[in-house]
C-alpha cells in the first residue's frame, strides 16, 4: 500500500483546518487500519518537509528535530508518521 493521499497546503490549513483533520488524520487512520486488517505486506507513507517546522537549514536531514511543526498541515503529517511507527511496532505492519 502506498499512501500519497492528503489535503495539502500550509497556509490554508491554518484558516480552514477541518478538511486537513478529516483527510490527513481520520482518512490516514482508516487506511492504515484497513491495511492491517487486510494483511497488507508493506505500507509506505509519504510525509512532508513541513514536519521540519521552523528549521532554518537549507537542506533538512533525517536526524533533524521534527517535533515542532509550524502549521496544522505539518502537524497532521507528523502525527501520521507517529501512527505509522506505532502500527509497525504494535502490529508488525512493515512500513
What do the predicted segments below correspond to?
Residues 15-33, 37, 41-42, 51-95:
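Catalytic helix-loop patch of NAD(P)-dependent Rossmann-fold dehydrogenases
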Amino acid at each position: 500500500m502506498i499512501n500519497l493521499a492528503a489535503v495539502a497546503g500550509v497556509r490554508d490549513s491554518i484558516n480552514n483546518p477541518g478538511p486537513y483533520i478529516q483527510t490527513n488524520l481520520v482518512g490516514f487512520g482508516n487506511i492504515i487500519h484497513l491495511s492491517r486488517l487486510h494483511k497488507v505486506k508493506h505500507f509506505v507513507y509519504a510525509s512532508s518537509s513541513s514536519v521540519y517546522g521552523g528549521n532554518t537549514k537549507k537542506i533538512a536531514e533525517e536526524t533533524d528535530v521534527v517535533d515542532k511543526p509550524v502549521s496544522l498541515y505539518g502537524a497532521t503529517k507528523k502525527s501520521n508518521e507517529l501512527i505509522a511507527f506505532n502500527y509497525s511496532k504494535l502490529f508488525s505492519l512493515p512500513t
